[in-house]
Amino acid sequence: VKLTQLYRGPHFLRGFDDDIREHLATEMRKKGIDLVFNCNIDMVEKKGDRLVADLNNGERIETDMVMYATGRRPATRGIGLEEAGVQLNDNGTIAVDEHFRSNVPSILALGDVLGRIELTPVATTEGMAVANTLFGGKPTTVDYSNVPSAVFSQPPIGSVGLTEAQAREAHADDIDVYLSEFRPLKHTISLNEER
């Protein structure tokens, strides 16, 4: 199988440390995956039993299959929020205060429709904060500063807390950075070089 992955930005996995992003790209290339950045598909047409994708960089890719992942957008338009007076941001997310109340006090929102960190455990934590605030008599806010995130890639990657760039911005050069690579024990037996 030959795989080409296009990404419209300068690199994938926005929000992760640059060295992690670069490491994953290197490992993917070792597996034979062709990565093309700053590129998008202009058009896909069927030619016989194949597909031809015209790219905005002038190249063409002939392939058996195209998967076009366009990102996520909250499905908040046209469900009556505007009629209820709820303020939506330009991207369709719902504007809320620190206790998840919209500008209409009886309407609260949490999870992916906020456009913050779109992870199930974050939405669960937000739901618990709302329950504590409304029913527990304990106004509760959510701290988004140390949310773990994982990508089920090969190799898998994860992070928690600030990226190096964010840490440098917040603490100038008063940080230490240590990098280490290791080969998982299971790979030593199979002679897999993945790190």
Please state what every model-predicted region is.
Residues 46-51, 104, 191-195:
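A short, glycine/Asx- and small/polar-enriched loop/turn
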Residues 112-119, 153, 183-188:
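Glycine-rich phosphate/pyrophosphate-binding beta-alpha loops
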Residues 59-85, 159-195:
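C-terminal catalytic lobe of FAD-dependent flavoproteins
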Residues 87-90, 137-146, 171-178:
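A short alpha-helix-loop-beta-strand transition element characteristic
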Residues 38-40, 91, 178-180:
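Conserved beta-strand termini and adjacent loop/short-helix elements that scaffold enzyme active sites
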Residues 33-34, 107, 175:
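Short, conserved active-site loop motifs that form the nucleotide-linked donor/cofactor pocket
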Residues 1-52, 56-57, 117-124, 132-166:
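Rossmann-like dinucleotide-binding cores of NAD(P)H-dependent redox enzymes
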Residues 60-138:
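FAD-site-proximal beta/loop scaffold in flavoenzymes
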